[in-house]
Amino acid sequence: MVDIIFSSSFLDDMGDHSKKKSGLAMCVGCGSQIHDQYILRVSPDLEWHAACLKCVECNQYLDETCTCFVRDGKTYCKRDYVRLFGIKCAKCTLGFSSSDLVMRARDSVYHIECFRCSVCSRQLLPGDEFSVRDEELLCRADHGLALERGPGGSPLSPGNIHTRGLHMAADPVSVRQTPHRNHVHKQSEKTTRVRTVLNEKQLHTLRTCYNANPRPDALMKEQLVEMTGLSPRVIRVWFQNKRCKDKKRSILMKQLQQQHGDKTNLQGMTGTALVAGSPIRHNPSVPGHPVDVQAYQPPWKALSEFALQSDLDQPAFQQLVSFSESGSLGNSSGSDVTSLSSQLPDTPNSMVPSPVET
């Protein structure tokens, strides 16, 4: 950052003694005293003549309108500083913008599109295993072929492979998060963790314990270490991943059930689930009287018994019974009913049907 301040000698000429600075302003570029009207100051305390502050590569004058970089006592503009000292892609040797995402392998930085196998040109994605040979990337398949062709003395012999072990590609990071090369090299010296593959017996043991207790205590984990032969970290991570997967699966099932319940539409009509309410008690305040039913006798039973005991005209009686059974009495004409009733004798009061005691 370049700041512009007034020179002390210029302030003396203006008669402003209150703003006079103690000491003399010396130019860092030429080493002489600054008597100009303006002084260009580069943070924190470097002062320059306006004519001395320029890029050592392109001789562009640097002022408050541009960014100034100082390295080893030399000043650079932003373009030349990035070109000379900025982080470059190990594949295409081009620089990075502030918004680029990069991939790292040991002390090298790559564009995402440049992070490819040098043999088959397959792009290496996060999670893929790779190796580094002479600052070049090899995928897992080509790394195995290089090891197999080693005894033949080919250029891809194990002696030329600096890293026999496979690394796992990490997620891309912002170029702003990429540290200096020396710092990157220190981080890359750490052992890269490789995914552990479990066999059927180990999986069965872990699943059985998970079904019994999804959150085992320290004692149970120690027993699992002895039973499976896995490290405590692998067992802890497996249980964490298992709980996370089950939680996601349960949330997904609830969403599917909710969506299935919302789709209860039939020919444009939406079905609504009805839920039966709780039973309520009988309200004794409702008026009512109990009825004692001792026996029930069909209405035509007494008439049939009377017909068997009396001398009635059988055809007329059968016609009357058929009317009562078929329910067609209401559809008959009034003359028929009158003719049938005229043929029946008068029934004495003593013959009125009464309930039969049982």
UniProtKB/Swiss-Prot annotation:
* Record bears the keyword Endoplasmic reticulum: no
Q: Which residues bind DNA?
A: 191-250
- Where do the segments described as Disordered lie? 325-358
UniProt-listed GO biological process terms: axonogenesis; exocrine pancreas development; neuron fate specification; positive regulation of transcription by RNA polymerase II; secondary heart field specification
Q: Which GO terms describe its cellular component?
A: nucleus
Keyword line:
Developmental protein, DNA-binding, Homeobox, LIM domain, Metal-binding, Nucleus, Repeat, Zinc
> InterPro entries of this UniProt entry?
HD, Homeobox_CS, Homeodomain-like_sf, ISL1/2-like, ISL1/2-like_LIM1, Znf_LIM
- Positions of the LIM zinc-binding domain: 27-80, 89-143
Instruction: Establish whether keyword Translocase is in the entry.
Output: no
Task: Give the Polar residues compositional bias ranges.
Answer: 336-358
* Segments of skewed composition (Low complexity): 325-335
- Name one molecular function that GO assigns to this entry: metal ion binding
Report the protein's function.
Answer: Binds to one of the cis-acting domain of the insulin gene enhancer. May be involved in the regional specification of the myotome and also in target recognition by the caudal primary neuron.
- This protein is called Insulin gene enhancer protein isl-2b
Q: Which organism is it from?
A: Danio rerio
